Amino acid sequence: MGWLINPSFFFICTNLIYFSKYQLHSGVSSLRPNSFFKNDDMFRYNSKERRNFKLLKNYNKYVEDHHCIPKQFKNHTLIKILNFDINNSKNIYIMPNKKGKSILNLHPDTLVHQGYHYKYNMFVKEHLDYILLKPEYDEKKYEFWLFFNHLKDNLQFNNNIPWK
C-alpha cells in the first residue's frame, strides 16, 4: 500500500521489479575485476533493451538516465583500478525530469534529472580522490562500494548528497 501514500514508490518499485530480474545486487562481489562485461548487461546505458523498456512503460519523455558515478570520471584512476564500467546498468538510475515529476504524480521532494549537476559531480570526484588514497586494493574496493551505495540510496529525495 506504499504506492497510495507515496506515488513515487510505485515508479521506483516498477523499475526495481523489472530490473532485478536481470541484475545481481551482490554488493562487494559485483566489483570483482572484469565483473562488468558489456555483453551480458542487457540494460546498460544506451542499450536497445533499455530504450525499449522506457518506451514500453511510456517513460521515454518523462525520465532521464543518471550515472551514479558520472561519465566524466570513466578515466579516473580509481575507476580504472577497480575496473568499474561506468555504463553498466548498476551505475544507471532512471530519474524523472521536471515534466515527469508532474505527469507521473511523484512526491514533491523527488529529485529531478534535467541536464548537468555540477555540485553532485564535484562531490563524487572529491570522494573518488579520497578513496584512491587508501593504501590497499581491498580497502579501496570496499570504500568505493560503500560510497556507491550511499549515492544510490540518496538519489530519490536528496537526503545526503548535493544536487545541481
Which residue ranges define each predicted feature?
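Short hydrophobic alpha-helical membrane-entry/anchor segments
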Residues: 20-21
